[in-house]
Amino acid sequence: MNSIEFPLLDRTTQNSVISTTLNDLSNWSRLSSLWPLLYGTSCCFIEFASLIGSRFDFDRYGLVPRSSPRQADLILTAGTVTMKMAPSLVRLYEQMPEPKYVIAMGACTITGGMFSTDSYSTVRGVDKLIPVDVYLPGCPPKPEAVIDAITKLRKKISREIYEDRIRSQQGDRCFTTNHKFCLVRSTRTGNYNQGLLYQPPSTSEIPPETFFNYKGSLSSHELVN
């Protein structure tokens, strides 16, 4: 279940010498020592807490939970993300050192879940804010599913090329690193109503009305994030 293949390693050399590329060596060193930053806001996070116990023992995967984003290379988002929380989540992601990874855990994180039906303040998918590497659906996902997602992420790390990853991250983000909403088409109700909105340097200084730039009165189904 937890086996990782390294097809580019040459173990046939004599005198116990392993020849490989610098990229593969870097991937191998990172996939077995992921340090997650746990960003839990709802019931999905309770399921992740079960992994800490002896039944699942996630320490065997090299996972060491960190409380500082500057010490983490994996952020695991679990639960509903609101527009008011969006700047804080993006700021945490930006403070993580490269290379960094994201696991979106649960229906509320991936699509907004049932809370986004008539809500004007719920983010309909955390991938609109930060690039997601692994989607973990469920309401909530079981601890076994979390382990499977971590295993799939490790396999992805073992095969990735760092330069390609950086290019894809720069092109797929809707909420950019300079805190600006991009004008993209909504998959639900048409075009977004927000213009290009800039935020102050400190998230504590962001007024609530920053995220809501409505022109005239809008019905509830037109309020999209």
Swiss-Prot record:
Compartment(s): Plastid, Chloroplast thylakoid membrane
Coiled-coil spans in chain: none
Gene3D superfamilies, per the entry: 3.40.50.12280
UniProt EC number: 7.1.1.-
Cofactor: [4Fe-4S] cluster
Top enzyme category: translocase
Gene Ontology CC: one annotated term: chloroplast thylakoid membrane
Pfam families: Oxidored_q6
Membrane topology, as annotated: Peripheral membrane protein
Record InterPro entries: NADH_UbQ_OxRdtase-like_20kDa (IPR006137), NADH_UQ_OxRdtase_20Kd_su (IPR006138)
UniProt remark on cofactor binding: Binds 1 [4Fe-4S] cluster.
Keywords: 4Fe-4S, Chloroplast, Iron, Iron-sulfur, Membrane, Metal-binding, NAD, NADP, Plastid, Plastoquinone, Quinone, Thylakoid, Translocase, Transport
Function: NDH shuttles electrons from NAD(P)H:plastoquinone, via FMN and iron-sulfur (Fe-S) centers, to quinones in the photosynthetic chain and possibly in a chloroplast respiratory chain. The immediate electron acceptor for the enzyme in this species is believed to be plastoquinone. Couples the redox reaction to proton translocation, and thus conserves the redox energy in a proton gradient.
Name the UniProt record assigns to this protein: NAD(P)H-quinone oxidoreductase subunit K, chloroplastic
Organism of origin: Gossypium hirsutum
